[in-house]
From Swiss-Prot:
Putative hydro-lyase catalyzing the first step of the transsulfuration pathway, where the hydroxyl group of L-serine is displaced by L-homocysteine in a beta-replacement reaction to form L-cystathionine, the precursor of L-cysteine. Required for inter-sister DNA repair during meiosis. May play a role in promoting apoptosis in the germline in response to endogenous and exogenous DNA damage. Dispensable for survival in response to atmospheric hydrogen sulfide or hydrogen cyanide. Expressed at a high level. It is an enzyme of class 4 (lyase). Belongs to the cysteine synthase/cystathionine beta-synthase family. Monomer. SUPFAM superfamilies: Tryptophan synthase beta subunit-like PLP-dependent enzymes. One of its GO terms (biological process) is DNA damage response. This is Putative cystathionine beta-synthase cbs-2. Pyridoxal 5'-phosphate binds at N413, G521, T522, G523, G524, T525, S612. It comes from Caenorhabditis elegans. InterPro entries: Cys_Synth/Cystath_Beta-Synth, TrpB-like_PALP, TrpB-like_PALP_sf. One of its GO terms (molecular function) is cystathionine beta-synthase activity. The gene is cbs-2. Keywords: Amino-acid biosynthesis, Cysteine biosynthesis, Cytoplasm, DNA damage, Lyase, Pyridoxal phosphate.
Length: 662
């Protein structure tokens, strides 16, 4: 294979602006509603900060002439829209203040704070009044106000970006767009693009569901009329949105659910063979605390108190079977996918521009943004691979849609990945997870339709009350249950050997790779990536990071903590999927440094990463200094997941202060 020149992105904004969002057909809903037309959804929640508004925010800053790093800027925006503007501001080093009516920041307050955005709730009843007050404040202080160009930016971003992507995907009869937040300008821009052939209808759906709902500016209403956007009012659609998530694995927010429901109604009136595209406004991140997200109708489940001790006869330190690569590598996601599972992999590699220099590091540091996988983490890869192997070979158990229950002990992300795969493939899913794992993970699992069983943090892996022990007991009680077992399944390292490592090598092109730094949990990530990197770049050094309190690298030197807060890395046993010989050296990590680094990456690079990502980057920089890597050296760090799972944890100042981290 001929490698390209380096394809890593200069900033996370470049990754967003140069990567189209994919379209996915709703096959199950088509059958359920007996439609003769096809409905596709455009996955705008896989943009860099999670919504369609990313396009408008980036364009608005491009259109704002004269804004320099360090300048103060105002914008009127709430919810996911505010997060989009805050992300761009973080990358550009701009001091952003977001204004909005009361309540508009409720679900995104910690995100905005971590991004460094100041928020001001104005004593007004709607966004139009907020824009007027913000404009007066900006003029009084001599501050640049983006409000004057936001609507135009959204119009142009969707006219020149979203609409051509839809057209490129194929013939479209109708496009449905939520009108919440900047959706009205987006709908107008898309309609303006398709007006040229008058064969595509654009429908705007008004819904009260969005956390960032705002009335469009008067000039936008004129554009909606000018470009013949058909307006429909949608009823409450929370129940349907849950159904969309559980049925198709489309992790969309409520205004997007309302738009899909309207698309179904529209499709019934269209000729057979028509195509309707729904532009999804945002994902589930900003709604995880909403009541509609928490009720999935699953009855609580516990294993029987009395059980045969033989069910615990299990050794997670031995891998079951060998693994070898057989698949062909595809470097990019196609524009149209077969299912949302095809939006797993091909995540962007981004160069850090500010953090390394701030910590005395001269070399190039690139981060692989795994939070842009379909389910939000690198564990999506192994979930998909393990299910594919089981479907093909019947190992470790035969899978039957509608009958099989997938059971998995996990720290959360593998469970989310498996829940996503189970939703699409038609399996039931039960996740056992320690109590310390975030409530956001639990809610995400719930909305995907999984049953969750929590277990004590202090239970050792071989205890009957641990997440592993409970999973083993439940497997023997539930007919047709299968544990795919990430600790022993060869599909775990294989996914990273075949895909993740290949993507890193492709994106680095003909550049040398001096150092790769990876956090270790089950060990599948580091084993798979390390083997492939060593095969193709034998001079590269692969370093694993393991938290104090974990034993993956042996006992901690000095007093070991009984508990560590960073999720997704470390264990109290050596999993069978970890090949210790594939790792050149190990570093021990602490919680405080990990979380502070994650917050710094978010604030200065605009990369919305999780705590284990901060852990990997902090200790990568430490290793860079130790090795005294020169300016032309290249370092790659994997960011396993994003902020969605930690909104009430390390993003929250009170949580950090309570643990002595701030």
């Amino acid at each position: 294979m001929c490698l390209p020149t380096i394809k890593a992105f200069k900033t996370i904004l470049d990754a967003g602006s140069h990567r189209a969002t994919q379209l996915v057909p709703l096959k199950k809903l088509k059958a359920e509603f007996q439609l003769k037309s096809d409905i596709y959804v455009k996955l705008e929640y896989l943009n860099i900060s999670g919504s369609l508004e990313d396009r408008a925010a980036h364009r608005a800053f491009e259109m704002s002439n004269g804004i320099q790093r360090g300048d103060e800027v105002y914008v009127t925006a709430g919810g996911s829209s505010a997060v989009s503007y805050a992300t761009v501001a973080a990358v550009k080093g701009v001091r952003l203040t977001a204004h909005a009516p009361p309540g508009a920041f409720d679900q995104v307050r910690t995100i905005l704070s971590t991004l460094g955005t100041k928020i001001v709730e104005l004593p007004v009843s709607n966004f139009r009044e907020a824009r007027l007050q913000a404009d007066l404040l900006a003029k009084r202080r001599g501050v640049y106000n983006l409000d004057g160009i936001c609507e135009k930016a959204a119009f142009l971003a969707n006219l020149e970006g979203t609409a051509p992507e839809i057209e490129k995907a194929g013939k479209t009869s109708a496009v449905v767009v939520p009108l919440d937040a900047g959706g009205a300008s987006a709908a107008a821009g898309i309609a303006a693009y398709f007006l040229k052939d008058q064969k595509t209808t654009v429908v705007g759906v008004r819904s009260s569901a969005s956390a960032s709902a705002s009335a469009p500016a008067p000039e936008t209403e004129v554009l909606l009329q000018k470009y013949k956007v058909e307006i429909r009012d949608a009823p409450e659609s929370y129940t349907f949105t849950r159904h969309l998530i559980e049925t198709e694995g489309i992790m969309a927010g409520p205004s997007s659910g309302a738009a899909v429901l309207e698309a179904i109604k529209l499709a019934k009136d269209l000729p057979a063979g028509s195509v309707v595209v729904v532009v999804l406004m945002d994902g589930i991140r900003d709604y995880l605390d909403a009541d509609w997200m928490k009720v999935n109708g699953k009855k609580p489940i516990k294993p029987r108190e009395i059980f045969d001790p033989k069910v615990l006869d299990y050794d997670p330190t031995k891998m079951v079977g060998e693994w070898k690569s057989s698949s062909k590598f595809r470097p990019e996601r196609p524009l149209v996918l077969d299912s949302v599972l095809d939006a797993i992999g091909k995540t962007p590699l981004v160069k850090l521009q500010h953090v390394p220099k701030a910590h005395g590091v001269r070399c190039n540091v690139y981060v692989k943004c795994e939070f842009l996988n379909a389910g939000g983490s690198t564990k999506d890869r192994i979930a998909k691979k393990m299910v594919e192997i089981a479907e093909k070979t019947g190992k470790p158990g035969a899978l039957t849609p509608g009958a099989t229950t997938l059971i998995e002990p996990t720290s959360g992300n593998t469970g989310i990945g498996l829940s996503l795969v189970a939703a699409v493939r038609g399996y039931k899913c039960l996740i056992t997870m320690p109590e310390k794992m975030s409530k956001e993970k639990s809610t995400t699992l719930s909305v995907l339709g999984s049953t969750i069983v929590r277990t004590p943090n202090e239970a050792a892996f071989n205890s009957p009350s641990s997440h592993i022990g409970v999973a083993l007991r439940l497997k023997h009680e539930i007919p047709g249950a299968v544990i795919l077992d990430q600790y022993c399944n060869p599909g775990n390292p294989l996914a990273h050997y075949e895909e993740t490592a290949e993507e890193i090598l492709w994106d680095m092109g003909d550049r040398k790779i001096d150092l790769v730094v990876l956090g270790a949990g089950t060990g599948g990530t580091i084993t798979g990536i390390s083997r492939k990197i060593h095969e193709r770049r034998p001079n590269a050094i692969v370093v694993g990071v393991d938290p104090n309190g974990s034993i993956l690298t042996g006992p901690t030197t000095g007093p070991a903590p009984d508990f560590y807060e960073v999720e997704g890395i470390g264990y109290d046993f050596i999993p069978g999927t970890l090949d210790e010989k594939s790792v050149d050296s190990w570093l021990k990590s602490d919680d405080k440094e990990s979380f502070l680094m994650a917050r710094e990456i978010i604030r200065t690079e605009g990369i919305l990463c999780g705590g284990s990502s901060g852990c990997a980057v902090h200790y990568a920089l430490e290793q860079c200094r130790k090795l005294d890597l020169p300016e032309d050296a290249n370092v790659v760090v994997l960011l396993p997941d994003g902020i969605r799972n930690y909104l009430t944890k390390f993003l929250d100042d009170d949580w950090m202060k309570a643990r002595g981290f701030l």
